[in-house]
Amino acid sequence: MLKSSSQGKESQMPALDELMSLPGVYGAIEFSCTGELGQTRGDLEPDFAELVAQMCAANMAIYRMQATGWTKLTGQKGFLPERGFAFLALDHVVMGMNGNAILARSKDFDYDAAYQRFNATA
């Protein structure tokens, strides 16, 4: 199992199964802060799942860099620690938090339910 980069604890396997039960979700992955792929759920090609893990880690790193810079530049606080993100496309969503990410169909996805589930499994 991967250690969650943001929480410093082992991720729980039931978390991925719980995330898979959300409306529209067709895949779930664990990812490390370095982009390593952990466990997966759903029918995801291994190369695609690895690419998603790397994208999730890169997105979190870019957010951290931007939030740190903005905080130092403006003095505004509240952007850190970084927790998660959602990428939206026409038909698909990738949402990640606490070292886990889900892939979902946009038309069926419930962002509020996903946010609550991510927080419940953290």
Give the role of each language-model region.
Residues 2-122:
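Non-catalytic interaction/Regulatory regions outside core domains
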